[in-house]
């Protein structure tokens, strides 16, 4: 998957970030399209055998205009991964297939700090849909807000401890890529219930 272009959310001029972040916006939908096209081309030069099918919005922010542009201009992007539980302006999702056919595959938790709220969210989602969806930035260990001050050993130990708990609590979970999990969401979304009373 891809995680935006220069970590800039796909948001047009005038998008309200509620004063929480200081991101630039895109002047036009065509500018957003050109940036993602450049990112897709660059990614294909690095990973020519891989198909990019997942878009993870930077800072979990995705405007309606940005989402529409992705759906219209990049048919290979079949999955969007925002968040299941939002705080402010984030792209909030359920596990489902949208009317335009794009699979909504939210993350439940992220990073390796794994505070009590994240553990609560993970526990609840295991009980609700028996899913663990976890996102890690490669640069988490370098970012103060995401744990760099704790150090690599602490972050690694946190993540190891979480994985030990997860596999102990939910041994039936399947390890899947976003593309594989997207197909599972498609199957889940198609489920129906029929009953016959006699």
Model-identified regions with their sequence ranges:
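Acidic (Asp/Glu)-rich catalytic clusters
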Residues: 1-5, 9, 94-98, 121-128
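C-terminal domain-boundary segment and adjacent tail
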Residues: 44-47, 72-95, 136-198
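Metal-dependent polysaccharide deacetylase catalytic core of the NodB/CE4 family, i.e.
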Residues: 1-65, 138
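Short conserved micro-motifs at the rims of enzyme active sites and ligand-binding pockets
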Residues: 11-13, 116, 144-147
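Catalytic-face loop-and-helix region of soluble metabolic enzyme cores
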Residues: 102-114
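A short acidic, amphipathic alpha-helical/loop segment
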Residues: 66-70
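Alpha-helical scaffolding within the catalytic cores
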Residues: 86-94, 112-123
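Structural recognition of the beta-strand scaffold that forms the well-ordered cores
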Residues: 1-2, 53-57, 78-82, 104, ...
